[in-house]
Amino acid sequence: MIIELKSVGKIFPKSQFRLDDISFNIEEGEIVGLIGSNGTGKSTILKMINGLIPYDKGNIYYQGKEVKSFSDNKLRQMRKDIAYIFQNHNLLVGESVYYHLALVYKLNHQKVNHDAINDILDFLGLMDLKQVKCHSLSGGQQQKVASAMAVLQKPKLILCDEISSALDTNSEKEIFNLLSDLREKYGISILMIAHHLSLLKQYCDRVMILDHQTIVDTVVPVKATLNQLESNYVDQVKEFLLHD
């Protein structure tokens, strides 16, 4: 098991929003989707997993060990093992695509693997743009660069926060294919937030549904039977995921 949340909660004192009793786990090599309407706390869950924001109750376990007990060095190592692809990528103005990919190795004090960089550029259709400054790229192309940086990190877990929102249909499928191939080749686990149910249904081993600030159900696409829930949103999502 790569990550586990047990009754995790988050309170925001200056607002009425809170997360309650978030419990789930992700196995090694598993692709898990997280779906929910806007404002239900999907991104907050990812940030708590990666340690970007603290959680107020419950426990998070990484590879079976409680994160709260980690030393600073252990936390740094965990964050190296968890790649986070944000919805709003932060690329350096004035620097090239290739510079950003080489930076992954430099930040980890590793020799730059030019072959690996060229392979990922070719896979994503960015080879002709490798010397182009990132601020000149389209939003979809910039998202591809951010995704490539995560892949080169060779993480144990990738957190994807609506990474396909700025991509056209073909580019979106390329990114999801890349993540799926990465899972198959390296056994990497992936937790992804997305609104395109057809892609979640196609690529995820299971999909968790977040409603009223808690996980209300977990669906194995197509294979499970539909349970009736009170939320119309949840019903509609499950109907789509469970039926061909």
Report each predicted region and the residues it spans:
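Helix-to-loop junction immediately C-terminal to a conserved catalytic motif
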Residues: N50
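Conserved ABC ATPase "signature" region
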Residues: H114-L129
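Conserved beta-strand-loop-alpha-helix hinge in the C-terminal portion
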Residues: T214-K238
